[in-house]
């Protein structure tokens, strides 16, 4: 089963995921938005995407606040090669199937 975690053992589901790819097709990014978290936002150091192939990680995380109140986390996962892009897509296929998410 594919999961996303900020804290070990606490699965999270993003509110939105956007995919971007360069014109050359070599580089890409996935931008995750999380508006409701189970994890304590004070202890988040990175995001882990875990499935049967292993683990993908990123530490590119930005918290969004409005009038001092937490609104969302924005996480960016960058892919530098076609192999990284393909690996990420395999993870997202598993994750979306496990969490009843669709593509728009």
UniProtKB/Swiss-Prot annotation:
Name the keywords, alphabetized.
Answer: Membrane, Photosynthesis, Photosystem II, Thylakoid
**Source taxon at top rank:** Bacteria
Could you state one GO cellular component term attached to this entry? plasma membrane-derived thylakoid membrane
Disulfide bridge positions per record: none
Query: What InterPro entries does this protein's entry cite?
Result: Psb28_c1_sf, PSII_Psb28_class-1
Q: What is its main location?
A: membrane
* Protein localization: Cellular thylakoid membrane
Q: Which Pfam families match?
A: Psb28
How the protein sits in the membrane?
Peripheral membrane protein
Biological process per Gene Ontology, one example term: photosynthesis
Similarity-based family: Belongs to the Psb28 family.
How this chain assembles, per its entry, is: Part of the photosystem II complex.
Q: What is this protein called?
A: Photosystem II reaction center Psb28 protein
Q: Which organism is it from?
A: Synechococcus sp. (strain JA-3-3Ab)
